[in-house]
Amino acid sequence: MTSLIFKNVTMSYPIYNAHSQSLRNQLVRVSTGGRIGGSRGEVVTVTALDNISFELNSGDSVGLIGHNGAGKSTLLRTMAGIYPASSGEIIREGSVATVFELGAGMDPELSGYENIMRMLLLLGNSVASAKSKIPEIEEFCELGDFLVLPVRTYSSGMTMRLMFAVATSMRPEILLIDEMFGTGDAAFQEKAEKRMRDWIAGSDIFVFASHDRSLIKKLCNRIFRLEHGLIYEESMDIL
């Protein structure tokens, strides 16, 4: 059975050359998403995730909420295995696909078609499987002749269309999305939302970080609120 389990997970990272009090004050002021720990010489330690535990199983669709810098993106990347935990245990049972920052995994000098193949192969597809997915991705993203052009010529909305189409063509057991719906025109957002509904209906675990609470209410059945590296499960009634 698909599952994603965090047991007392902490993720800390050092900030080097933090030799001045002004830098320390700046770190606090911009809110890193965690806590600023004690400095060791010229190193300041930031605890982005602080001893958090939860369990996700098949059927869980989780909305992550919290202010900018609360730790949502850090949590998603730790879920995906991009960031290693400093301590604690993470158990992942199931394949993972992500939609994070614009252009992640893409080569801007390659065409849309070439990037589709590149991303699908990076996600573990065979060449034959990747080629079989191209027509459906092409139809969904609606980029037409732009797919033969370098991705560096794309707008941010076009790039997100392509990334989203590739990620959701995979049908992974676990899908992690960071603020995906904030980019793109209204028509594509509506189309993407419908695709997500269809995906969730037949999926295992879905985790979505967003400031759009109305969209979280439509797509999710659990709410995690992050604040200064800590996690709290909230009732859906807060939306």
Swiss-Prot record:
Transmembrane segments: none annotated. ATP binds at residues 66-73. GO terms for molecular function: ABC-type transporter activity; ATP binding; ATP hydrolysis activity. Its main location: membrane. It comes from the Bacteria. It is a peripheral membrane protein. It holds the Pfam family ABC_tran. GO terms for cellular component: plasma membrane. It is found in: Cell inner membrane. Keywords: ATP-binding, Cell inner membrane, Cell membrane, Membrane, Nucleotide-binding, Polysaccharide transport, Sugar transport, Transport. Residues 28-239 form the ABC transporter domain. GO terms for biological process: polysaccharide transport. Belongs to the ABC transporter superfamily. May form an ATP-driven O-antigen export apparatus, in association with RfbD. This is O-antigen export system ATP-binding protein RfbE. The lineage of its organism: Bacteria, Pseudomonadati, Pseudomonadota, Gammaproteobacteria, Enterobacterales.
